[in-house]
């Protein structure tokens, strides 16, 4: 299961217990529950989840937030430096710090995500781009695939917004 903004659930005792049990059972049944948060503070209250997490992805954060994440996760200074170095180029790629724990050993490094143009348009959070996507979606009568193809430049001689 994917749990978006899991910090909200951690504030409800019964929900927090359920989320923690998903992570404990995940190991036993070879499941891979995913908890997503954009708030560093959510991680501080998620010790049970963190203790049963084998893979962590961290996107670009401020230097202060990088220190918070490193402290909460108990990362070495080398990992802290990698998190502070994260970058990317808008519309092309983003960098993420990924840490994998196997048999009580942790390894981490920086990866780059280079999305296709269609995936970029699907996932963009930029308000201007979201508005353009909405306009293009309207021009294609709600056909998301065709709207994305148009924005990605994969359609010739078609409606352009």
Pin down the residues of each PLM region.
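Generic detector of well-ordered alpha-helical segments enriched in charged/polar residues
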Residues: 50, 66-70, 80-84, 134, ...
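Conserved P-loop NTPase motor cores
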Residues: 1-82
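Electropositive, surface-exposed helix/loop patches at the edges of structured domains
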Residues: 67-87, 92-105
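Conserved P-loop NTPase motor module
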Residues: 89-161
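Glycine-rich loops and low-complexity Gly/Arg-rich segments
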Residues: 25-29, 58-62, 81-86, 122-128, ...
């Amino acid at each position: 299961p994917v749990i978006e903004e899991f910090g909200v659930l951690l504030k409800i005792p019964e929900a927090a217990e359920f989320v923690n049990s998903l992570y404990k059972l995940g190991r036993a049944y070879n499941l891979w529950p995913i908890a997503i948060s954009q708030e560093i503070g959510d991680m501080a209250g998620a010790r049970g989840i963190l203790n049963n997490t084998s893979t962590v992805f961290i996107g670009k954060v401020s230097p202060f937030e990088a220190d918070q994440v490193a402290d909460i996760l108990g990362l070495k200074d080398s990992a802290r430096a990698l998190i502070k170095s994260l970058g990317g180029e808008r519309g092309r790629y983003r960098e993420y710090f990924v840490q994998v724990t196997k048999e009580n050993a942790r390894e981490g490094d920086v990866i780059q995500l280079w999305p296709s143009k269609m995936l970029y348009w699907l996932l963009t959070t930029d308000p201007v781009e979201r508005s353009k996507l909405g306009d293009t979606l309207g021009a294609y009568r709600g056909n998301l695939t065709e709207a994305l193809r148009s924005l990605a430049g994969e359609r010739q001689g078609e409606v352009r917004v």
